[in-house]
Amino acid sequence: MTNYFLYISTLILLISCEQNNNQQQEQQQENPTSDSLAVVNDPKNNLNIQTNSFSEIDSSGVLIFPLSMGESEREEGSLSYKEMPNNGYWNIIFYNSKTKEYKLLSERKMLIRNYDYKYGSGDNDNFSQTTNHIFYTVCTDDFNKDKKLTYQDPQYLFISDKFGNNFRQISPTNYNLNNWKFIKSSNKVIMTVGNDSDKNKRFDNSDEITTFEIELDKGVETNEVFEGDFKNKLKILFDRDWKRLK
């Protein structure tokens, strides 16, 4: 009797395993169709990577490819992605033509307005002897909360080395970059930045423009140049000389 029950149990187990195998085979046969539909319907398939232009950095063999992205319309004419501002890039590829290695500048969400690796190269001054950095003007924060990055959001000054490594922000957060200059003699970057003084989520002509500086290659934070007492003195002098008379 014991052998009989053992035989029955084994038979049931074998039948169950065979049914499971059949179900898995049926699912595998169905999956190619569903996977194909998923691929066709995936909006990423309508994206067209665009490396329109590239340049070499200081005869180093390292090339930089600013990235744009085109999108093919669906059959019904709809688009799946937000339109980027003109003359903006969403990332940059660094390609070493000697080693065939390549990398992205960063995987963070950003809008690159421009980049500069020849800054300070005028008057026959070799830029590679001036600094080993590339400078970028970048938007990373949706400051006005419109759910997209545009030139209405603050522009920050970023730097990296000439191979795209150590990409980091050097201008203060929530301040809009107005102007900047690399000072070779002090190895500093001096920048003027706008503060949204009236808290209207816009950077306009009435906002305060502040001056900051950072010494490169020192690992220090960006500091405001003019101290609070000096700025208060400027306001007192202006109030004395330019206040409207009643």
Write out the residue ranges for each language-model feature:
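Surface loop/turn motifs at the tips and blade-to-blade linkers of beta-strand repeat domains
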Residues: 106-109, 170-174
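Extracellular-facing segments of soluble proteins and assemblies that are Gly/Ser/Thr-biased and enriched
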Residues: 95-158
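Acidic, glycine-anchored loop motifs typical of Ca2+
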Residues: 144-151, 196-205
